[in-house]
Amino acid sequence: MRKGERMLATSKEWERPRPVEASCSEGVLKVLKGCRTILKGNRHDSLYILQGSVETGESNLAETAKDETRLWHSRLAHMSQRGMELLVKKGFLDSSKVSSLKFCEDCIYGKTHRVNFSTGQHTTKNPLDYVHSDLWGAPSVPLSF
């Protein structure tokens, strides 16, 4: 939206309950945040023409520098630095896109191993200490081989 343009809101949108504090009386819509009016508009037919202008401000976002090496490292299933250098030598990758590879957290997590369970100790002394039973029962659908 450009500066100087007006915003429109339908009256039906603001006459139902909302999580913001809004009041509609005598054809005037007011939206409050605490005790501060953040939006005001006059009703014309079934629309509220909102007063004010669009404010632009600073953003809390930052643009990160593109790291082509890390991007290709991820695209090539986390290929090693040596493997990417080999692709450069063979002409499959541009040498300007590959530099020294920095730390990759995903590679570290991928190299971890699960902890194995210790070997089970079975201490049966009498027959039928372990009872195995068929809990599934007979199949309800005939089996065909």
From Swiss-Prot:
Q: Where in the cell is it found?
A: Mitochondrion
Which key words tag this protein in UniProt? Mitochondrion
Look up the domain of life of the source: Eukaryota
* A GO cellular component annotation in the UniProt record: mitochondrion
The record's annotation in Pfam families points to: gag_pre-integrs
Q: What is its main location?
A: mitochondrion
Xref: InterPro entries: GAG-pre-integrase_dom
Q: What else is known?
A: A stretch of 270 kb of the mitochondrial genome is duplicated within the centromere of chromosome 2 resulting in the duplication of the gene. The expression of this duplicated gene (At2g07736) is not demonstrated.
Specify the protein name: Uncharacterized mitochondrial protein AtMg00300
Tell me the organism: Arabidopsis thaliana (Mouse-ear cress)
